[in-house]
Each structure stands twice: as C-alpha cells, then as structure tokens.
A protein has these predicted regions:
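Metal- and O2-centered redox machinery and metal/ROS homeostasis
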Residues: 1-121
Length: 121
C-alpha cells in the first residue's frame, strides 16, 4: 500500500476482515493453509499480469502477490508434502470443510456488499 502512495486515511478506510476462519484443529489449519498457499501460488500469475499491464517492476505496488518470490513453487511442494503426510490420519471432510470456510470468509470480505454472498456446500 505504501508503494501505491495511499495515505494513512485511505489505508484506514480499507475494509478489515473481522470474521477469520477457525483454526482450533489440525484439520482446520490444513484446510486454511490450502487456501492461503494456493492463493500464494496463484499470486504468481497475478503478479505477471500486473507487471505487464501496469508496467510495475520489482514487486513495488504488488508485493502481496510476490510472497515467497522464486521459492513459491518449492513452498507449494512443501505444503503438499505436509498435507499428504497428515491427511490420511485426519478427517478429510473436515479439511475440505475448513478450506471452504476459509475461502468463503475471504471471498465475502472482499465482495462485502458488492456481490452475492458465496457459501460452499
């Protein structure tokens, strides 16, 4: 935000996510991490688009999408290995439900009154 020259007042006016997903169980943590790590992986595509479209470089103005930088693929593979190691011993339906809840909460925060609420089945 600082790279985009947003003033303190503009930053303070941005909506806050006040309904974070639950993370009280290992299943909830893994489900939430699936969404976060998947978004991090997808951020690489967004970063390239922002660079090409807006002419920004070096992550300035879009560093959120660059997170792990060149280590993004390696971090995704590490998460997949962790998920694969734990998932067989846990309740898979709970992991999926937590991923859906995490996605729903962040989606609803972003659209906040500008679109239809999303709810995973």
């Amino acid at each position: 935000m600082a790279d985009l020259d947003l003033g303190e007042k503009a930053r303070a006016a941005l909506p806050r996510c006040d309904r974070l997903p639950a993370v009280g169980t290992t299943e909830q943590v893994l489900g939430g991490m699936y969404v976060f790590e998947g978004a991090t992986l997808g951020g690489q595509f967004i970063a390239r688009h922002v660079e090409a479209t807006l002419g920004l470089t070096g992550g300035r103005g879009y560093s959120f999408f660059c997170s792990y930088g060149v280590a993004t693929g390696r971090m995704w593979q590490a998460f997949r290995a962790t998920l694969s190691a734990y998932a067989p011993r846990l309740d898979g339906d709970s992991i999926v439900a937590s991923a859906c809840e995490t996605f729903d909460r962040f989606h609803n925060w972003i659209v906040d009154g500008r679109g239809e609420r999303l709810t995973c089945p």
